[in-house]
Amino acid sequence: MFDLLALTLAGQVPAEQQGENANLHWRWLTEGLLEMTPKPGYRQAVVLSAGIHGNETAPIELLNQLVKDLLNGDRPLAVRLLVVLGNPAAMRAGKRYLHSDMNRMFGGRYRDFDHSGETARAQQLEQVIAEFFADEGAARFHYDLHTAIRDSRLPRFGILPFQTRPYSAEMLALLDAADLDALVIHSAPGGTFSHFTSEHAGAASCTLELGKARPFGVNDLQQFAAINRALQAAVSGEPLPLRSGSELRIFRVERSLIKRSEEFRLHLSDDTANFTELKQGTLLCDQPGEEYRVQHVSEWILFPNPGVALGLRAGMVLVEAPRSTLY
């Protein structure tokens, strides 16, 4: 049976583009895209994606091993499954992206960027998702796996897209079982892959940040054992593992820090970790005509990056929220 990651990195097409084993039918759609359907039927349709940023290799390796186990018959499949390796060209180059950040392009936002391989791929992925979920009566899920650029005080966390409906109890149970440290609830629509599948496909979706970006072959996948066990259980229809970590913390985005001037200043050191706590009154950022000081007793910073282009988000300010916010 073929190796999806090896084929994708080599830019090759499998000798056979569809097949089956005792448990499932599989179909290679195009580069980095594989669909699998269980023979006994299913109640869930699941998208598992990684590599939207090409240098975030650990989740790619994790998904590739899951695909191998399913194709080799070492693990049963109980859901209809679409596996997405998001940005093959950037994966081959070992870079986050080649031209522009694909995870800002979904929901048709690729039209706002100069044409590139990434805009074409984002458009292609939107079409593939639409076709995968078309006329699908089963419950829909999407887990988009990433690793972070910087260190994090809470190293494993999920980001839930903004939506007006309650978040899926089944999805939240999986995220709990995956031993995530925190969940962050977005307060506005965005261009992420998970927001697209939530808004346009009605899927229960989450972006998962699972450690730091490292080159292929040097990841310690044991660090990802909890999320791996949870995803394995989900695709195989097995009971979820019991949570072993401390209680999951819930945050919501209070404010996005938008860089409107080249004079924008973020008053944090370059090595400030995600989820660093900030005390009330602290001057966090300023630019001509605008400054932001911490408003609540405590706020937390996520994805600080003052080097972004004008008009883009240079960080997010979080406040802690009760779990009831999810329902």
Swiss-Prot record:
Any one Pfam family here would be AstE_AspA_cat
Catalyzed reactions per annotation: N-succinyl-L-glutamate + H2O = L-glutamate + succinate
What are the entry keywords?
Answer: Arginine metabolism, Hydrolase, Metal-binding, Zinc
Q: Does the keyword Zinc apply?
A: yes
The EC class name is hydrolase
Q: Which domain of life is it from?
A: Bacteria
* Active site (UniProt): 209
Q: Which InterPro entries match?
A: AspA/AstE_fam (IPR050178), AstE_AspA_cat (IPR055438), Aste_AspA_hybrid_dom (IPR007036), SuccinylGlu_desuccinylase (IPR016681)
**What's a GO biological-process term for it?**
arginine catabolic process to succinate
Cysteine pairs forming cystine bridges in this chain are: none
Look up the record and name the cofactor or cofactors this protein needs. Answer: Zn(2+)
Select a single GO molecular function from the record's annotations and give it: succinylglutamate desuccinylase activity
* Protein's name in the database: Succinylglutamate desuccinylase
Organism name: Serratia proteamaculans (strain 568)
Q: What is the lineage of its organism?
A: Bacteria, Pseudomonadati, Pseudomonadota, Gammaproteobacteria, Enterobacterales
